[in-house]
Amino acid sequence: MKTITVKFDDVFTDVCRSSEYIGAKFDVYDKVRATEYDNEQMMQWFADAMANVGVILDRLLAKKIATSFITGEATMTLNVQNNNMEQIKDCATRLATAHMLALWLEITAPELVQTAKLEEQQLSQQLMRLAYYREMPR
């Protein structure tokens, strides 16, 4: 049994960095920078993002994934033999970030939401490829 742990703090930090980058790139920095936020709303978005990741992995790995949220931490337990676990964790974290960023941009800069949704779609496909590939037993 292998476990992937994705932390809210890591994802939220990435969302803040990404919003600052996008804001600077498209000259809407003050509009999209994540300074004031509702913690309960952010945790709900994080739960939605991780549920999205869980659905992708559950469908591909055909195994039950237990997802639990304890003090801002999502733990997914994967009962599968897969040698890409670190890459899967990294991609899952980035996918959760893209999902939350898209939700943030819908509120702050709807004209830029397509950028985040495209990133989310690409990361979903990458996660599918990583989860699907398993090294053959020798």
Model-derived features: positions:
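Conserved short "hinge" loops at termini or chain/domain junctions
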Residues: 1-85, 115, 122-138
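Elongated alpha-helical scaffolds
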Residues: 91-103
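Charged, low-complexity interaction regions
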Residues: 104, 108-113
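Short, solvent-exposed helix-helix connector turns and helix-capping sites enriched
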Residues: 109, 117-120
